[in-house]
From Swiss-Prot:
EC identifiers of the protein: 2.1.2.9
Gene3D superfamilies (UniProt xref): 3.40.50.12230
Function as written in the Swiss-Prot or TrEMBL entry: Attaches a formyl group to the free amino group of methionyl-tRNA(fMet). The formyl group appears to play a dual role in the initiator identity of N-formylmethionyl-tRNA by promoting its recognition by IF2 and preventing the misappropriation of this tRNA by the elongation apparatus.
Protein name (record): Methionyl-tRNA formyltransferase
InterPro entries: Fmt, Formyl_trans_C, Formyl_transf_N, Formyl_transf_N_sf, Formyl_transferase-like_C_sf, GART_AS, Met-tRNA-FMT_C, Met-tRNA-FMT_N
NCBIfam families reported for this sequence: fmt (TIGR00460)
Keyword Nucleotide-binding: no
Keywords assigned by UniProt, alphabetized: Protein biosynthesis, Transferase
Species of origin: Rhizobium etli (strain ATCC 51251 / DSM 11541 / JCM 21823 / NBRC 15573 / CFN 42)
Gene encoding the protein: fmt
Family: Belongs to the Fmt family.
Amino acid sequence: MSLSIIFMGTPEFSVPTLRLLADAGHRIVAVYTQPPRPGGRRGLDLQKSPVHQAAELLGLPVFTPVNFKDAEERERFAAFKADVAVVVAYGLLLPEAVLNGTRDGCYNGHASLLPRWRGAAPIQRAIMAGDEKTGMMVMKMDKGLDTGPVALSREVEIGPNMTAGELHDRLMQVGAKAMAEAMVKLEMNDLPLTPQPQDGVLYAAKIDKAETRIDFGRDARDVHNHIRGLAPFPGAWFELEIGGKPERVKVLGSELAEGQGTAGQLLTDDLLVGCASGAVRLTRLQKAGGKPLAAADFLRGTPLGAGTRLS
């Protein structure tokens, strides 16, 4: 036996779930993903999403509506008469006609332990807040923002130096297995739903460019969490005067270290930076237009000594 599934997703995070459901023998009757976007060096090429590309390799039909406001689009969705829709980082709002457009509704893979970190950036926000654990949850979608009842939960530890990129990759695999397990249980009519608690609700707002600059005037642990929560994308940054001009430098790795001194000033010649309390050592950096470099390699090209100001 197998389910007939409409899969809805867009980024690389969604791809392992699509592949695992297909490998499990479910009938993927349609794949919905966001439309191709301008890309390439000049932005002249239209680039298909990772899910779009994966679906084509699997020989699956792909649909790329801009939204579901058109009645014809909603009717096409319902016409598949699918058992269930699986949604993983699709990126479009789904109207009730779509949420109720399959026999068993829509099940979403969400990268947090709900109700903590509902919303667009749960991975980054969990690390930036210093959380020591997070997870993947399979929830049945309703018309609220990540408010539906939970079907399955898998907890994941967040290491003290783990970056958002590393956590993303871990949750991507955990989430795929969780969704595959949930679909087996759904097929067996053995997938009980548990309402989310009313307490502990936090919203994971989309990362704004204005919050990516590093404020060394904060506690060292907060600075470290800020850096790793934004690595590798969009990247936390500071400005450094190079050749008489301010240049933006991204920090893609850091660690807490012993030290105390002026906030935003290098305390040693190996990128130990003072904070309001304590210090952080910058371990991986990237200049504008350059490639990411380990601290030692960065310093070979841009020597910096104790007393240098980072702003």
